[in-house]
């Protein structure tokens, strides 16, 4: 039976990730934030209105790379700290302050793209040929030139970046801090409920009455928040539509795909393949689940059931390490060493606690190790999540080590398409 979710302060330290691998303490974070502001002010003073040669352009971008590195560390530290506990008011307030400081710096630096876009293509190409580290940044300037707004407008948009991200923050706050799930009851027995308890435990429970009751109780609570969720989503969609129009795209699809370097025909093909080719197999899969588990009918609450219950043993975290290490050993010694480091250096946040983000993700701040979030339930699905996220870690370990920070912001299509989970 699933256990009541703990508060973050009550979980075991060994189940949490070690953010001191980014900054040893908050003082170190604040020192880097101050350095960020100092470097930003100096760069603006030295280069605003003076990007008139290939050498000057590359000098400016060399210093911008250092600034981007600090932004990545400060931003990741704060985001990771808040992602595990939306009830931690100190970390939430700290993240708000740091995000405001980052927005102010990015607003001050918006002159770079505006001024570069006003230069001739010949000058930008000359600068790109002179610096491997800055080449892709400069090529992106040329690609985005037709969609850039006035310098004043771009500066304002950068300053408002924290505000324009509000819809997702509102959604997460409602989901992780405000929603209080009641216990549900089956045959006179009460069961605790929460986001991760449902998504990572009850959805896989082979007791049909418990699984479906959990689904009903979970869905009922989501229904209570449908209006605020819809309002937040609508705000995000309206913002994307407005920006698409302002930047001269034909529609929102083209605007969003442009940012991901994805051609519209490729996107349409993927959607068509899923609907036309995958759908029949998924219907067969649902019928198979019904036969294996002897269900009267297959509902949405039943789709996460294991096809082979005997293939889903309960596991410890240490046992997961053995599965993952053996499974990924084919990728070589460096990969196995990375897996070992991930476990021993606490790259993972395994804890189940109230206020923690759901699902799983891997963050790989430039120049540091990766950080992987999940809620451990001791199922084989958790092992697959670990292997999946370590795949991202391995990708960005190699990517970050070999390339300029300008070249590590890769398209979602590149890093998700190889994964069957995405």
Label each PLM-derived region with a short phrase.
Residues 1-310, 321:
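A well-structured
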Residues 10-15, 301-304, 366-370, 396-402:
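Short acidic (Asp/Glu) and glycine-rich catalytic loops that position anionic groups and cofactors
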Residues 240-243, 251, 258, 349-363, ...:
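Peripheral/terminal regions associated with large enzymatic or DNA-binding modules
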Residues 311-366, 379-380:
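Auxiliary, metal-adjacent structural segments of Zn-dependent hydrolase domains
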Residues 373-386:
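Short pre-active-site segment immediately N-terminal to the catalytic Zn-binding motif
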Residues 385, 389, 393:
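Catalytic glutamate of the conserved HExxH
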Residues 396-414:
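Post-HEXXH active-site segment of zinc metalloproteases
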Residues 415-422:
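Conserved small/polar residues in nucleotide/adenosyl-binding loops
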């Amino acid at each position: 039976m699933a256990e009541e979710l703990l508060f973050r302060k009550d979980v075991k330290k060994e189940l949490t990730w070690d953010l001191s691998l980014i900054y040893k303490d908050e003082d170190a974070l604040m020192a880097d934030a101050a350095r960020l502001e100092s470097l930003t002010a100096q760069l603006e003073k030295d280069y605003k209105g003076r990007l008139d040669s290939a050498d000057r352009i590359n000098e400016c971008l060399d210093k911008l790379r250092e600034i981007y590195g600090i932004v990545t560390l400060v931003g990741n530290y704060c985001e990771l700290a808040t992602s595990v506990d939306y009830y931690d008011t100190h970390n939430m307030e700290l993240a708000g302050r740091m995000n405001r400081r980052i927005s102010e710096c990015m607003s001050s630096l918006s002159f770079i793209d505006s001024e570069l876009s006003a230069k001739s293509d010949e000058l930008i190409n000359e600068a790109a040929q002179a610096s491997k580290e800055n080449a892709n940044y400069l090529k992106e300037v040329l690609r985005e030139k037709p969609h850039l707004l006035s310098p004043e407008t771009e500066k304002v948009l950068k300053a408002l970046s924290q505000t324009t991200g509000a819809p997702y923050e509102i959604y997460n706050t409602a989901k992780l801090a405000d929603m209080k799930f009641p216990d549900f009851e089956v045959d006179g027995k009460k069961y605790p409920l929460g986001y991760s308890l449902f998504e990572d435990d009850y959805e896989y429970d082979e007791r049909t009455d418990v699984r479906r009751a959990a689904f009903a109780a979970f869905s009922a609570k989501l229904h209570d928040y449908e209006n605020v969720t819809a309002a937040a989503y609508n705000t995000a969609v309206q913002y994307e539509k407005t920006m698409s129009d302002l930047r001269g795209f034909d529609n929102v699809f083209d605007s969003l795909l442009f940012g991901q370097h994805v051609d519209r025909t490729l996107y349409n093909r993927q959607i068509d393949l899923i609907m036309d080719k995958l759908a029949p197999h998924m219907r067969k899969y649902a019928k198979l689940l019904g036969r294996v588990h002897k269900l009267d009918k297959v509902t949405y609450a039943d789709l996460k059931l294991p096809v082979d219950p005997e293939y889903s043993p309960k596991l410890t975290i240490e046992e997961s390490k053995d599965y993952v290490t053996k499974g990924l050993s084919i990728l070589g010694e460096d990969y196995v060493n990375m897996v070992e480091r991930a476990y021993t250096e606490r790259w993972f946040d395994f804890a189940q606690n109230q206020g923690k983000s759901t699902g799983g993700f891997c963050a790989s701040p430039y120049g540091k190790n990766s950080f992987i979030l999940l809620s451990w339930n001791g199922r084989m699905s958790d092992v697959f999540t670990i292997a999946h996220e370590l795949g991202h870690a391995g990708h960005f370990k190699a990517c970050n080590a070999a390339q300029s920070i300008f070249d590590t912001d890769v398209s979602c299509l590149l890093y998700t398409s190889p994964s069957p989970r995405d």
